[in-house]
Amino acid sequence: MCSFRGRGGRAAGPAAPGFPDVHHRNRAGERDIPGLAPTVAGRSRRPGADPTRCFNDPMSTIDFAPSERSRLGLEWEIACVDRRSGELSPAAPDLLARLGPATEFPHVTGELLTNTVEIVSAPHHKAAHAVADLTRMVERIHRLAEPMGVQLMSSGTHPFSQWFQQQVTPGNDRYATLIDRTRWWGRQMMIWGVHVHVAVDDRDKVLPIVDGLLTYLPHFQALSASSPFWSGETTGYASNRALMFQQLPTAGLPPHFRDWAEYESMVADLMHTGVIDVLSELRWDIRPSPRWGTIEVRTFDGISTANEIGAIAALTQCLVEHFSRELDAGRTIPVLQPWFVRENKWRTARYGMDAIIIQNPSGDERLVTDDLRALVRALEPVAADLGCTAELLDVLAIIDHGASYQRQLRVAQATDGSLKAVVSSLVRELLDGRPDRSRPSPDDPSVTQARSGRAD
């Protein structure tokens, strides 16, 4: 089994601009397994699953697939909405039937709810090429959806649809088991996100890079925050999705692992006790994806524009490549204490771009947008090597013009609280591929059906 090089100690010389000073991270591995409300022998397991398979042997290993360094792939969850009402529409099964089998990349798949489709790009070296996959598939889905009276949008949550009116995708044992186990919280998962995979060329690097990326989780979350509303209410949070999703027992922040063997041991424990049946049921905000040889960042709220997806993809790719170079050079990766990581997640879920985050183990603080500007400058040489400079610089445009949650709140304010107007703006953004910075009038006929902060 592997142990990791480059962990511990202070880096020689001052920290680079935009990167916190490096200290040794000292925390015990978190091995808390939630108590399960018993259904069958204390566990809820997929029908027909073998509780002894694969990971009952403590010597079992999890192979990390070979992959081309820093290639990336994108997954974009998209909601189907009714053209007239703006409500969520259970149109995904019909759309998927019209699209045909997902046999190659890029492709479209179903998700937990029948109102959702997910677009998966092919792996690419350049962020722009992965984003182009997504936009081509969006155009194809839109052409099929339009005659059905269905429109497409992406945000962390829907502004006013009700969770209890949504349908779970039938015929999927994994989804049925999730809902059976998690009940009320599982049914509340009316949320959407973007996932960014970046390939890592050496398994020994994976867990240190995951730890390093957790330092930048608040940056990811602030840039993508797009869920200020829930069931017709203004929540006061930039990313309500971030706090909703972590209610699932295997979601939220990942534990710290000393090495790959400890990660394998934890997976064996969870398999043996029925907490998970397959590795993908570990739904952490940032996680290893051994099947693809990648690290998967799942922190991002649903993003309504291809332009912004390119920005967060480039930022993620550049950080992973930067950390990989640091490890190659024998240097350590900056990490934070787990209590600071948790606090940063809450702060940016609550305050978004106005959050003051904890930068380093010493507890120094800084406005997240100021730290993002410095981070972009520090990563520009890496971006030049990866061919994603333009996409990385789009991070600055999000800072200057506002993240999705800010735009949604502005639309609601400009239209006397119309959440249907918010949905309309999200639909326009997805089709245009760029943020909608217009301010609709309260007299716009597309928004007169809904006022007072709720949809009529």
Which sequence ranges carry the predicted segments?
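C-terminal accessory/tail domains of diverse enzymes
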Residues: 57-148, 178, 245-456
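Well-ordered mid-protein domain cores that form the structural environment of catalytic cofactors
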Residues: 124-191
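An acidic/histidine-cluster motif and surrounding catalytic segment
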Residues: 196
